[in-house]
Regions:
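OB-fold/S1-family RNA-binding modules
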Residues: 1-142, 147-148, 250-271
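Conserved glycine-centered short motifs in functionally critical loops
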Residues: 9, 15, 36, 136-271
Length: 271
């Protein structure tokens, strides 16, 4: 990457390369560099013409910055319900990622008769993301609990009790849990120390496979994570860089009755 950059950038300039560029071709880097150099020349020209303090350049809108940072071939598309924002993003994608132009879709609320959030069941998904319990495809579940010090995720078989081999049932359930936990960490923006209680497995190779599956699922997470080996008790300790406050903090308040304890003490038993 450094060799390519030395070829495409002028010696008097420096660049910061984002992680998303690790698989970029030399042509793509050259195109992006040319765009940035044109932008810089435009800024310099504006500076020369300015007679006093003036705005020379500003970052694009938040929506465009999110598209720039996050949108890639992994996404099926972007749906926008604001006409001006749709035009802005469609123009941006057309300029810098024209191969993705057909993935930008406009949602006409008036014509559809439903808001974008209603049609895409966004509110429903947010409610699910705030629940402590998450169901797995085979009938097992996750229970996600937050404490002051860390987040605990408990894996349960639930309805998935299997019909023959208990070890295979537990192994299969843990594999599903590994995928879903990685998804929930991103969806809920959970950071800090996280302890995962996978269901106990007797076969060491199964433990290794579950941990590898979990690490592979986490590899799609742009937020830095560190995962430690699974213990004899089936516990996995990990850390995830805390970027924001998390979904729960943004959408919930501490219960004024129990003050966040989740229980009510029966004081009549103490009298």
């Amino acid at each position: 990457m450094r060799t390519i950059l030395d070829r495409v950038k002028p010696a008097e300039h420096g660049v910061i390369v984002r992680t998303a560029a690790e698989n970029a071709t030399e042509h793509e880097l050259q195109t992006d560099m040319s765009r940035l150099l044109d932008l810089w020349e435009d800024i310099k020209e504006r500076s020369k013409k300015a007679n006093g303090p003036t705005l020379l350049y500003r970052e694009p809108s938040l929506a465009v910055r999110v598209i720039r940072e996050e949108f890639n071939s992994d996404y099926r598309g972007i749906i926008i319900d604001d006409p001006e924002l749709f035009d802005e993003i469609h123009q941006y994608i057309g300029d810098f990622n024209p191969e993705f132009s057909d993935r930008i879709e406009f949602h006409d609320t008036q014509a559809e008769g439903l808001s974008l959030f209603e049609k895409q069941h966004v509110h429903e998904q947010i409610h699910k993301a705030l629940d402590t319990k998450v169901w797995l495809p085979s009938g097992g579940s996750l229970v996600i609990e937050h404490t002051e010090a860390l987040t605990v995720i408990d894996v349960n078989t639930g309805k998935n009790i299997g019909k023959t081999n208990l070890e295979e049932t537990v192994f299969s359930n843990n594999l599903e849990a590994a995928d879903e936990i990685a998804r929930q960490l991103r969806l809920r923006d959970i950071g800090g120390i996280i302890v995962i209680d996978f269901i106990d497995m007797d076969i060491r190779e199964n433990r290794r496979k579950v941990l590898e599956r979990f690490k592979d699922a986490l590899s799609r997470d742009k937020t830095r994570t560190q995962v430690f080996e699974i213990s004899e008790l089936g516990l996995v300790e990990m850390t995830r860089k805390r970027i924001g406050e998390g979904l729960l903090t943004n959408f919930a308040d501490t219960c004024p009755t129990c003050e966040g304890r989740g229980i009510m003490v029966d004081h009549s038993m103490l009298d």
